[in-house]
Amino acid sequence: MAVVPIRIVGDPVLRTETTPIPVGDDGSLPAEVADLIRDLYETMDAANGVGLAANQIGVSQRVFVYDCPDSRGRAGRRRGVVINPVLETSDIPETMPDPDDDEEGCLSVPGEQFPTGRADWARVTGLDADGSPITVEGTGLFARMLQHETGHLDGFLYLDRLIGRHARAAKRAVKHNGWGVPGLSWTPGEDPDPFGH
């Protein structure tokens, strides 16, 4: 399929709750979902991302893909897709996030990273690419990714979770970069890599 432009903060599709993908009585998914999943994987891979939600490429459907280390410091990676995810988490800390351990980035906020409070454990239930039920869970970075991508599908950005000086720094970065308006995007493989991979 294709690498697709990634929408940047300010695009309304990022602030709109996505629509669940319909499932047939026989458990089948619409044929075009396979193409969407391929586009998501190709775009995420070209961007060197650990996850990508459909609305980040302008498609308001409830699906995300991931290719993420199992947890910080471990060598293994987990790769997959979750359709119509439902998220569960452990408690989210109410303290100021640690700038060394809690830094988070987003392909829709290219090149920026800010400390973000997240639960250390998360689980999503949903469907795989064949429409079969799946459960995916993890801790650390993997849990952070599950929360981040499901948040996208609910119409939120990680910037919404920032507090204190980190929230102020993010607002300055959005303004400095000229974001926060509709119609902005970047295309992995064509535009410079904002994260310097």
Curated annotation (Swiss-Prot):
Family annotation (InterPro entries): Peptide_deformylase, Peptide_deformylase_sf
GO molecular function terms noted in the UniProt entry: metal ion binding; peptide deformylase activity
Cofactor comment: Binds 1 Fe(2+) ion.
Signal peptide: none
Keyword check for Secreted: no
Entry keywords, A to Z: Hydrolase, Iron, Metal-binding, Protein biosynthesis
Enzyme type, top EC level: hydrolase
Needed cofactors: Fe(2+)
Residues that coordinate or bind Fe cation: C106, H148, H152
GO process annotations (BP): co-translational protein modification; translation
Active site, per annotation: E149
Role, per record: Removes the formyl group from the N-terminal Met of newly synthesized proteins. Requires at least a dipeptide for an efficient rate of reaction. N-terminal L-methionine is a prerequisite for activity but the enzyme has broad specificity at other positions.
Protein name, as recorded: Peptide deformylase
Species whose genome carries this gene: Mycobacterium sp. (strain KMS)
